[in-house]
Design a protein with these regions (language model features):
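Structural preference for solvent-exposed beta-strand-turn elements
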Residues: 1-168
């Protein structure tokens, strides 16, 4: 529920679409400069998160996968459409799913709707070894793990500076 301040956001379509998606979910976003924003997520509309409109928008934005960890941690469930968006080669979602499962998430895929559902009664910290040092996979797992009970240790985690910043 605490405000989050993000600095140096590029003014690009994917970032702006992700901001609009967060606003539609109920996140209050205040732009403090052309590249800085303050986010306040104390009025998230959990019903909207299950709507066809939300799922359609997720399907058009690869970055929507980054909502899974935080939504699972805060609300015990998340749904996203199979992410589309850019076409920059093969980027698997396995790391995201395997890490969230290790924390206690149960993942289902509806092939007809192309929707992933994940739920957990309680997330539990654990040791995990990632098959690949995925930047977004590591970030998603970290964002879920902060609200898990116990300690989470991730081996073969991505170690880019922004991942290190996320840890602080």
């Amino acid at each position: 529920d605490a405000p989050v301040i993000l600095h140096n956001l590029p003014d690009i379509l994917d970032i702006n679409n992700q901001i609009r998606l967060l606003q539609d979910v109920g996140v209050s976003i205040q732009r403090t400069s052309p590249h800085d924003i303050i986010l306040q997520a104390n009025a998230v509309d959990t019903q909207y998160l299950q709507s066809d409109e939300f799922l359609q928008r997720c399907g058009k934005l690869r970055g929507s996968v980054m909502l899974m960890g935080p939504l699972l941690a805060r609300f015990g469930q998340a749904m996203i459409a199979r992410p589309g968006g850019d076409n920059i080669g093969r980027r698997r979602l396995d790391t995201h799913f395997l890490g969230l499962e290790k924390l206690g998430g149960k993942i289902l895929y509806d092939s007809q709707r192309q929707v992933f559902s994940i739920s957990a009664k309680k997330l539990q910290g654990t040791y995990m070894l990632l098959d690949e040092a995925s930047i977004t996979g590591t970030a998603n797992i970290l964002m879920a793990a902060v609200l898990a009970e116990g300690t989470t240790t991730i081996y073969n985690a991505a170690c880019e500076p922004y991942i290190q910043q996320l840890c602080h």
